[in-house]
Design a protein with these regions (language model features):
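Primarily recognizes the serine-hydrolase "nucleophile elbow" in alpha/beta-hydrolase
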Residues: 128-201, 217-218
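N-terminal cap/lid segment of alpha/beta-hydrolase-fold proteins
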Residues: 20-65
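Short beta-strand/loop motif that positions the catalytic acidic residue
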Residues: 235-237, 241
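Short amphipathic alpha-helix adjacent to the substrate-entry channel of hydrolases
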Residues: 84-104
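Short beta-strand element of the alpha/beta-hydrolase
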Residues: 67-76
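Mobile cap/lid helix-loop segments that gate and shape the active-site cleft of serine hydrolases
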Residues: 43, 191-225, 231
């Protein structure tokens, strides 16, 4: 296993040992916001530091267990790297275990030398991925109105952007332009939301750069972008998170309530900035069960197949 992992790290080709398929979603020569540079994937310590080809890794449940829903997973990493195992693969496998198709997003990072507008790259990739899932939903056994998005930490910021920003940044003049780029629901784990007083400074710097104009701060503080069309959200955070202030989740939840968007917020006493699928302390360990029950309650997965 060590030798195999070393070969993967050296080659920079296949990122995920257990991924079913890698799906590049931008046609050759059509990717927006690019200088045309040819980049290679850069990986170290289960983190991706440079994305060569944006795309997504598909994980499907068995046909017998498939419940017809899908979730696009946005790994965290402070917009500097992608923590593709703990906030990617592990989540995908959990979703598969409850009958949900999962897609781990390999999105361009703002520090990519190929990006023209650094702050737009991640959202462009997320919007395109959602459109691509919609386009292939029938062949994958996915219902068109049950395509959600999940994000942890900075990935939660990207997921909240996808749900709250109505502007289309991913149109390239092909048939997918006519397809929805907005998710049907959001699952946010310890999300970065605010770019102002409660900002995670590393994520803000990596996304927006050093010179912070008020316009950019407001535009990328996603609690300020919530609107009546924003999809329902399930949000979790830990009170003792020393990296991303739980006020981020509270602000987003309050914004959803103000716009009369259905939302569920759970703030656990312990967990720090390490809420994940495994090894959560105390009551935080129940979050996956709560999330599954929420998806049943909201009608995104059927109750009859979950028992």
């Amino acid at each position: 296993m060590v030798k195999l992992l070393l070969l993967i790290l050296l080659s920079g080709s296949s990122l995920f040992l257990n991924a079913q398929d890698f799906i590049p979603f931008w046609p050759e020569g059509k990717m927006p916001n690019t200088k045309g540079m040819k980049l290679k994937d850069s990986i170290a310590n289960e983190r991706i530091y440079q994305v060569g080809t944006p795309g997504m890794y598909a994980y499907f449940p068995s046909k017998q267990e498939n419940k017809g829903a899908a979730v696009l997973i946005c790994p965290g990493g402070g917009y500097e790297r992608l923590a593709y195992v703990i906030s990617g693969i592990q989540l995908a496998k959990w979703l598969n275990s409850i009958g949900i198709s999962a897609f781990v997003l390999n999105y361009r990072l703002p520090n990519s030398p190929d990006l023209i507008e650094r702050e737009k790259g991640p959202l462009q990739d997320a919007q395109r991925a959602i459109r691509y899932i919609h386009t292939h939903a029938n062949e994958w056994g996915i219902k068109q109105d049950k395509i959600g998005i999940q994000g942890s930490s900075a990935g939660g910021h990207l997921a909240s952007q996808a749900g709250s920003i109505n502007a289309d940044f991913s149109a390239i003049g092909d048939s997918l332009d006519k397809v929805s780029f907005v998710p049907d629901f959001m699952i946010l784990v310890s999300p970065v939301i605010d770019m102002g007083i409660y900002a995670h400074k590393g994520s803000r710097k990596n996304l927006l750069g050093e010179n912070l104009a008020d316009k950019l701060i407001k535009q990328y503080s996603t609690q300020l972008q919530v609107n009546a069309k924003t999809p329902p959200a399930f949000i979790i955070h830990a009170s003792n998170d020393q990296s991303v202030n739980p006020q981020n989740s509270i602000l987003f939840y309050q914004a959803l309530l103000e716009k009369k968007v259905s939302a569920s917020l759970h703030i656990f006493p312990q967990g720090g900035h390490a809420l994940a699928i495994r090894n959560n302390p105390g009551s935080a360990n129940a979050w996956t069960n709560l999330c599954e029950e929420w998806m049943i309650e909201m009608g995104f997965i059927p109750e009859s197949l979950s028992k």
